[in-house]
A protein has these predicted regions:
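Catalytic Tyr-X3-Lys loop
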Residues: 105-124, 144, 168, 212, ...
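C-terminal helical subdomain
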Residues: 188, 209-241, 246-250
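Residue(s) in the substrate-gating loop at a strand-loop-helix junction
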Residues: 148
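Alpha-helical segment proximal to the catalytic Tyr-Lys
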Residues: 132, 177-178, 239
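Active-site helix of classical SDR
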Residues: 127, 164, 172
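Canonical Rossmann dinucleotide-binding motif of NAD(H)/NADP(H)-dependent dehydrogenases/reductases
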Residues: 4-36
């Protein structure tokens, strides 16, 4: 049996109620972490807490809107107060803010500001709070930022979103250099289109079929695919990895016949 070095460590997962975040919380618990689960969906948090406890680990549930000033700091402080420390932070924040993909000429200033705020600015706020706690504690740790495959290539309909996620990649690299001397690793994962409940509801069957046909491995991510990758990077298996963006898209970045967005 491989020792991942995660037993007894404490992880904080934001955006933890559905999809990738929920899978990450569950898999970190399976790997031995106690987990603080954070999401603004107050009704959904208890279910993820039960997921963690079902794996025999301690859990803290916190309903919080990280867009509010000071909330990221409060969430980190609550995690340490309840679970004793912080070792791993997974920043699964950000989305299209309910706005959906759109041609760039239809992305007005309000659209761009909202998408950048919910992706780059939220991630930066979380990183700042987590890094401060890890450096102060002096025992090192790992910060994992959830980026996107759309940050690595032109993404029709996702100009603001892709740019915000690309900025997260740069933030990840810079923090890796700044925090490395304190023993803190910072990495990012870039999922391709992942079959979360939100994505399943948003995409037509015809579009999904066309997208799968364009992907070299002929499949799309499930949330568990990303969760296993996060666990590997957060564990001692990934102890030499920092400042890296790790793609998990089944080869979609190599596709030349990717279907156009359905709005087009």
């Amino acid at each position: 049996m491989i020792d991942l070095g995660l037993t007894g460590r404490v992880a904080l997962v934001t955006g933890a109620v559905v999809g990738i975040g929920r899978a990450v919380a569950r898999w970190l618990a399976r790997a031995g972490c106690d987990v603080a689960v954070v999401d603004r969906d107050e009704d959904g948090v208890p279910d993820v807490v039960e997921d963690v406890r079902a794996e025999g680990r301690q859990a803290l549930g916190r309903a919080a809107d990280l867009r509010e000033d000071g909330t990221a700091d409060a969430v980190v402080a609550d995690t340490i107060a309840a679970l004793g420390r912080l070792d791993v932070a997974v920043n699964n924040v950000g989305s299209l803010a309910g706005l959906g993909p759109a041609p760039f000429l239809d992305q007005d200033a309000a659209y761009v500001h909202e998408v950048v705020s919910q992706n780059l600015l939220l991630t930066a706020a979380c990183c700042r709070a987590e890094a401060d706690a890890l450096v102060t504690a002096g025992h090192g740790g790992v910060i994992v930022n959830v980026s996107s495959g759309e940050s690595t290539r032109p993404a029709l309909g996702l100009a603001a979103y892709g740019a915000a996620k690309a900025a997260i990649n740069h933030l990840t690299q810079t923090l890796a250099v700044e925090l490395g001397p304190s023993g803190v690793r910072v990495v990012a994962v870039a999922p391709g289109t992942t079959l979360t409940p939100t994505v399943r509801a948003a995409l037509s069957d015809d579009y999904v079929t066309a997208l799968v046909e364009s992907i070299p491995l002929g499949r799309m991510n499930e949330p568990d695919d990303l969760a296993r990758l996060v666990v590997a990077l957060a564990s001692d298996l990934g102890r030499g990895v920092t400042g890296q963006l790790v793609l998990s898209d089944n080869g979609a970045h190599l596709a030349r016949n990717r279907p156009r967005p359905e709005y087009a």
